[in-house]
From Swiss-Prot:
It holds the Pfam family Astacin. It comes from Caenorhabditis elegans. Glycans are attached at N67, N185, N337, N370. GO terms for molecular function: metalloendopeptidase activity; zinc ion binding. It comes from the Eukaryota. Keywords: Cleavage on pair of basic residues, Disulfide bond, EGF-like domain, Glycoprotein, Hydrolase, Metal-binding, Metalloprotease, Protease, Secreted, Signal, Zinc, Zymogen. This is Zinc metalloproteinase nas-20. Transmembrane segments: none annotated.
């Protein structure tokens, strides 16, 4: 069986043969040299005593990567250099390719998810944690004695993103790893794959469409897909060949007065960690040159803990459509109902999780001109 997969990763330069990840202690400097890249952009892998549900999880992760990069995966139990994916005591992976070796990548039930599968594969491709970036002190307050938080000699090919699948959650019981911007308290540790995660992976492995005869004018932060140069990879809420369409997206026209909308259904609360997140998108439009304002007014049935890992809502107000804006999943967070303003038109709202995270409501309006409103709480 042969599986072809494409995906993006963070570039590292440094020391080989170290373990990454959850429930595993590591050397403080674990970056990799370029020789740790997989040759010909192809990884060989196979499953070993891996439960069927975890196999399905990895196939989803591989298919995702295949659709977003020029990388390929080949299922090959006889390969001299390969990744053996098995059940273990924790979720971890070696960094990069180890020539002539069968290297282990493990999952355990207490940490297994689609996002974790992507996270560990990206380690095997040569990507370090977000908290190990050389610029992390501009964005995080960390305990440098923590073995997972040592700065590595990374090549920062994309902006720092609090929503990266490679970034650990904040530590809710201490100040060992907290965001300098407190609005990202619940965003760190998300199990979503961020747009910049794939951009990074593509840049690291040189995946691009530079030699393709047709150049596409991708819109709204999108870029030509190295997996299929006849289409663009699109940011949240956009689709179509050039990322200028909203098929399957709720398109709402903002007015000068506050209007209300949301997602309302009767499913019971719950989570399914082994599947890809399901998304519902809203695109709020307004006259050209306007500022669009949005505020969440109700959250119900979301799984709430110290990070919005399995479900949540993102009001994408950041000017850079590729970056992750603060995530919301808990109505006891004093930031959850802040008014967000953006000149991005349309203004995109993303709800993620599954149909068991049932209910959120929001209000929206536009203000003529480029107005920047200070965040406010609803009373």
């Amino acid at each position: 069986m042969k599986i072809t997969v494409n995906f993006l990763l963070v570039a590292l330069i440094g020391v080989p043969s170290v373990l990454s990840d959850r429930h595993i202690t590591r050397d403080k400097r674990q970056a990799m040299r370029d020789y740790a890249k997989w040759e010909n952009n192809k990884m060989s892998l196979f499953f070993y005593n891996l439960p069927l549900e975890m196999q399905a999880m990895f196939r989803d992760a591989i298919n995702y990567l295949e659709n977003h990069t020029c990388l390929k995966f080949e299922y090959n139990e006889n390969a001299e250099t390969a990744v053996r994916i098995r059940k273990g005591n924790g979720c971890y992976s070696l960094y990069g390719m180890h020539a002539g070796e069968v290297q282990d990548l493990t999952l355990d039930y207490n940490c297994a998810s689609f996002g974790t599968a992507v996270h560990e594969i990206m380690h095997a491709l040569g990507i370090a944690h977000g908290q190990a970036r050389s610029d992390r002190d501009d964005y995080l307050i960390v305990d440098s004695t923590n073995s997972n938080d040592g700065i590595e000699n990374t090549e920062n090919l994309v902006p720092f993103d609090y929503g990266s699948v490679m970034l650990y959650a904040r530590d809710p019981h201490s100040d060992k790893r907290i965001p300098i911007d407190p609005e990202y308290n619940f965003t760190m540790g998300s199990l979503r794959v961020a747009f910049y995660d794939m951009v990074l992976l593509n840049k690291f492995y040189g995946c691009n469409c530079d030699n393709h005869p047709r150049k596409l004018d991708c819109k709204n932060g999108g870029y030509q897909n190295p997996a299929n140069c006849e289409e663009c990879l699109c940011t949240d809420g956009f689709n179509g060949q050039l990322c200028d369409q909203h098929e399957g997206v709720y398109v709402l026209e903002a007015k000068k007065e506050w209007d209300a909308s949301g997602v309302r259904n009767n499913y019971r609360k719950g989570i399914e960690t082994n599947t890809m997140p399901e998304y519902t998108y809203f695109a709020l439009t307004a006259p050209e040159g306007s500022t669009i304002e949005v505020r969440i007014t109700k959250l119900s049935g979301f799984f709430c803990q110290h990070t919005c890992d399995y479900n949540g809502v993102e009001l994408k107000y950041k000017t850079d459509r590729r970056i992750v804006s603060p995530l919301v999943c808990c109505d006891n967070d004093n930031l959850w109902n802040k008014t967000r303003s953006s000149t991005n038109n349309p203004f995109i709202i993303a709800k993620y999780g599954n149909n068991r995270t049932p209910h959120f409501e929001f209000e929206y309006r536009y203000i003529p001109g480029n107005a920047t409103a200070a965040p406010e709480e609803n009373n």
